[in-house]
Amino acid sequence: MVDNQDNVNEPPKNTFLSRVFGVHSSAVENSIDGAEMSHISIHNSQEFNHFVENEHHERLIESDQESSTNEEESNDEEPLIKQPQSIRFQEVPNGIAITHPFSESEDDEGEIEGRDPEFFSDQDLGSSISKHGQGSSSEDESEQAPTGDDAGPIGFERNSPIVENTRLGFHSPYDANSKANLKGPYLGHSKVFDRIFANKPAGMSRNRRHDDLEESFLFRKPSVADPRSTKTPAPFNLKPPPIFQNVPNLTSVNKNSLSTLSPKERALWKWANVENLDTFLQQVYDYFLGNGFYCIIVDKVVQLATILFVVFISTYMGHCIDYSRLSSSHSFKEVHIEQCYKTQISPTAKVLLWIFYAFIGLKILQLYFDVKALKDVQNFYNYLLGISDKDLPTIPWQSVVQQLVLLKDQNAITANATEVKAKNRLSAHDVANRIMRKENFVIALYDNNILDLSLPIPLFRTCALTKSLEWNINLCILGFAFNERGYLKQAFLRESQREYLSEELKKRFVLAGFLNIILSPFLVTYFILLNFFRYFNEYKTTPGSIGSRQYTPIAEWRFREYNELYHIFEKRKKLSMVIADDYISQFPNTLMSSLLSFVQFVSGSFVAILGILTVFDPDNFLNFEITSDRTVLFYMTLFGSIWAICHGAINEEYTAFSPEETLRELISFTHYSPKSWEGKYHTEDIKEEFCKLYNLRIILLLKELVSIILTPFILWFSLPKNSDRIIDFFRECTVYEEGLGYVCKYAMFDGAKVNKGLNAKTQASKMFSQTDNDDESDSDNDIGVNKMLQSYMYFVDDYKKAENALGKNQLISPKEGSFGYPRDYSWKTQFALGKKINKRSGEGPSQRRNLEHGSANPDVGSLNASFINKSSLYKDDFTENTDEMKKGNGVMGLLNQYYKKYDNKR
């Protein structure tokens, strides 16, 4: 990176602490061990523009990372140009990524004052949190920040109807866009969603000052209002983090003297000196998932004890028991071999055991350091966020993010610097992007079908993704694409490095294949023993559970949305399993049922015969050997298990055949419906295709076992052929976002940007325009909506709906007055023209399942991201939300307005 030679007076070093608490002296700087994070001098707007335009002073694009490879440092490529706006990479002949900042345009007709808002405008990006390793944008941007009633970027008067029904009082500046702006392989062309994302009428807008504060929680946007005015979701009315007054004293504390600080001061010092925000936020989220300090420690100890037990019991049972004397012995001492570890274990096994003991020692040492790190995170939660460990199992993640946002604002206010106040900001979108920086790329990787996991073998041409193969893929690809700090290497953005990176990736695949060959015997043994101990008792006591199903690894990646955190996805996935079982059970398999009935009859007959004979001589007949070393008791257990398995697999109950309706309800949870499924929901082919995603657990265990053997061959022969596509994928799917660094372009929700080519009046009219022949409901059109736009909708809804502010294991509670309405209606039925919803107790699939599980309200257990929350679709005279629905809050309110308007015309 080239520094500006014209700048004689070098400004102070740009550290995270200086951004948060103001510029400090060199004496303090050296004492607090502040890390240098940028070699770029901070210029004003004129100097910055001159600096960028000067061809002799081009500088590399900076992100949160530094290159960790020697090949990047010695690269002869021309540096990538950086603009202070959002960066998009496009391939050009010379291999240099050219940047295209978003342009701003006025309304065509000028009927509404200001400009059409842009979801992530240049002003929004300029006011984002300053990323580590990057200089701030021009100071003029912060000086032009509006105040008072005009607070917020110009033109942010109209909000998206999706986010109108708010939880925390936040509104999105998201405006309408037409199909011209929603183009590309991942952008939908749904008419319904064109209307949903159309511009809202001017009469539905609110105070812009309030909107700026609200939107700052979800997306990076400056706020001039007091952050203390932000409301937190009930029942956790957390107090905003306090403004700390002793920060100047803490800045003079040396890193080696942290032991002299109190826990609160230590937590504040750690927060002020964060060097890698991605790692820090990941630790905060892991602490939230683990439910606190002691729960995480106990979980780590239990995992370590599980490994020890599996190795100990397998070694002991294999070398310390004399099985030849079992039949003639009556006590354990008679079959136990004394000093078996010295006399029975071979030297090779002893070496392996000592290696295992060394591994356990390293895990214990790692646990010691984990305890120290967890203690710091605990202090951060308790003293800075005001959240105790007792609240973590039930507190919503949205509340934690809100406290993080407020804490960042309080630190900026403490610095008393205009630039820091305006630009050092966090948001829910930033937090999710940083935590899921790698996961978002993995989601896009599988969604684009980049990887070829087949083998040139007739029986394995469609090899499925397994956990062991997934672990190897992450190790080879993500471990190569991201440096040790967790950021994408800039070499992946240069087309000239494509061939070199592809060859290096092939070498990693081949090396990983050899390592899997070496470790496969141990992995197979451990896998068999672990699952045997885990599932044997379950299958023995309840043999019918052998027919239980679970989602495959590839299904989990395809179902997961961009920026959807793990606990949100897990809740949605588990809630969908009940509906998935109901859907599959509606397709009777007559042929299999006939065969299983015969096997059940035969096995039951043998059990009956042996049981009757046992009555005559119970003492001796149970030990009677029917075959060599196989007694009556053995065969009774065997045939009894076979009978139970067949009985559980045969569905003898009468079920209502409504696969199409059930699958639509299932799709509302999985958010997955290929276009090939349209119009075929009731067919056996779609059911079989879904069963590949929701397979039998016993089948998945067998596939995992076989995968340990086949993984080396996939790494040798299949994945190296995709190396070029993988490198191209990272270059084409990576964007640079100021304040975040290099991220997956689909995770930035660029498809939600407004179309400035249409004025507000035209977009508002398109939202309410619908032909009488448009019989498809919004639920039906969800099928054709692209994943990125769908991820945006559910992300906004997850963080804005009050009913979604729940703990990790909590469901939506029943609402007063919501009983007695059918919940199995499609959107078309619910909003049918000229019809009213009947007050009756419907018995659709959802309601029947909830009644079976003891739930009076069918909405309980329906996560559905509440974007299509069914409880909000019904006009309830007994609830207090009637007025808000009439005002048109949210997507449902807009649809209600449209149909009400249509009925009035009639």
Curated annotation (Swiss-Prot):
Spell out the post-translational modification annotation for this entry: Phosphorylated by ATG1. ATG1 phosphorylation is required for ATG18 interaction and preautophagosome elongation.
Gene Ontology cellular-component annotations: autophagosome; cytoplasmic vesicle membrane; endoplasmic reticulum membrane; Golgi membrane; phagophore assembly site membrane
Compositional bias (Acidic residues): 63-78
Q: Which UniProt keywords apply?
A: Autophagy, Cytoplasmic vesicle, Endoplasmic reticulum, Golgi apparatus, Lipid transport, Membrane, Transmembrane, Transmembrane helix, Transport
In the record, where are the intramembrane regions found?
509-529, 698-718
Q: Which reaction is recorded as catalysed by this protein?
A: a 1,2-diacyl-sn-glycero-3-phosphocholine(in) = a 1,2-diacyl-sn-glycero-3-phosphocholine(out); a 1,2-diacyl-sn-glycero-3-phospho-L-serine(in) = a 1,2-diacyl-sn-glycero-3-phospho-L-serine(out); a 1,2-diacyl-sn-glycero-3-phosphoethanolamine(in) = a 1,2-diacyl-sn-glycero-3-phosphoethanolamine(out); a 1,2-diacyl-sn-glycero-3-phospho-(1D-myo-inositol-3-phosphate)(in) = a 1,2-diacyl-sn-glycero-3-phospho-(1D-myo-inositol-3-phosphate)(out)
Result of knocking out the encoding gene: Still forms preautophagosomal structures (PAS) in proximity to the vacuolar membrane.
- Low complexity bias (residue ranges): 126-137
Q: Where in the cell is it found?
A: Preautophagosomal structure membrane; Cytoplasmic vesicle membrane; Golgi apparatus membrane; Endoplasmic reticulum membrane
Residue stretches spanning the membrane: 293-313, 351-371, 596-616, 631-651
An individual GO BP term: reticulophagy
**Annotated region (Disordered), positions in chain:** 58-88, 100-159, 838-863
Q: Its principal location? A: membrane
Role according to the record: Phospholipid scramblase involved in autophagy and cytoplasm to vacuole transport (Cvt) vesicle formation. Cycles between the preautophagosomal structure/phagophore assembly site (PAS) and the cytoplasmic vesicle pool and supplies membrane for the growing autophagosome. Lipid scramblase activity plays a key role in preautophagosomal structure/phagophore assembly by distributing the phospholipids that arrive through ATG2 from the cytoplasmic to the luminal leaflet of the bilayer, thereby driving autophagosomal membrane expansion. Required for mitophagy.
- PANTHER family assigned to the protein according to its UniProt record, in alphabetical order: APG9 AUTOPHAGY 9, AUTOPHAGY-RELATED PROTEIN 9
Q: What else is known?
A: Kluyveromyces marxianus proteins are shorter in length and have a more ordered secondary structure than their S.cerevisiae counterparts, which might contribute to the superior thermotolerance and solubility. K.marxianus could be therefore useful as a new model organism for further elucidation of the molecular details of autophagy.
What is the designated name of this protein? Autophagy-related protein 9
* Protein species of origin: Kluyveromyces marxianus (strain DMKU3-1042 / BCC 29191 / NBRC 104275)
